[in-house]
Regions:
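Hard-cation-handling environments
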Residues: 159-176
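Conserved acidic, small-residue-rich alpha-beta core segments centered on
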Residues: 2-158
Length: 176
């Protein structure tokens, strides 16, 4: 049950398991595409790697799972697919803009970008599909972006330039 986190943090986390390369692509207003890279060639762990996910895995946790799956660096195990939240939000604290000592005005969460796998597809609505599916306590419950009212549609962009991980096992043999 990982609802996500900060975009730059997940780029750095992914970098712990790959040498260098793209981690995620983001597209903002005007269809401007930006690729976020891990530029640190050091690898903290180069041994076997499994990513555990379920329907509650969303946003930044989907970026990590998708990137390591696209690199064929890790085997993703869990529910059929993750939450399917392929958007980046920023929180705007209204108290910073309107001074009112009587009560808390709250905040607005604004969607500013859509993110895409390095292989080009979005995780929006579809999530990250597990390589190996296992049942869990949420399997029978409809949870996900596709169950929300008026979700953004799934789409794809060109894939980023990346090389699959050349590691210790044949990825396809493990997941088939």
């Amino acid at each position: 049950n990982n609802g996500g986190g900060a975009l730059q943090t997940v780029v750095e986390m992914t970098g712990l398991f790959i040498k260098t390369g793209p981690v995620v692509q983001v597209k903002s207003i005007g269809n401007r595409k930006k690729v976020l890279f891990d530029r640190d060639p050091s690898v903290t762990w180069d041994g076997p790697l499994v990513i555990l996910v379920n329907q509650m895995s969303a946003s930044a946790s989907e970026i990590l799972a998708a990137a390591l799956q696209d690199y064929e660096r890790a085997v993703v195990i869990g529910s059929d697919n993750t939450f399917g939240k392929g958007t980046v939000q920023n929180v705007l604290d209204l108290n910073r803009f309107i001074s009112n000592s009587n009560f808390d005005l709250g905040a607005l969460k604004i969607t500013t970008e859509k993110f895409y796998r390095i292989s080009g597809g979005s995780v929006q609505l579809k999530g990250v599909e597990s390589d190996i599916v296992t049942p869990n306590r949420f399997s029978h419950i409809k949870i996900g972006e596709s169950d929300e009212k008026n979700p953004l549609e799934w789409d794809q962009i060109d894939k980023a330039n990346y090389q699959k991980w050349n590691g210790y096992f044949n990825y396809k043999d493990v997941v088939e």
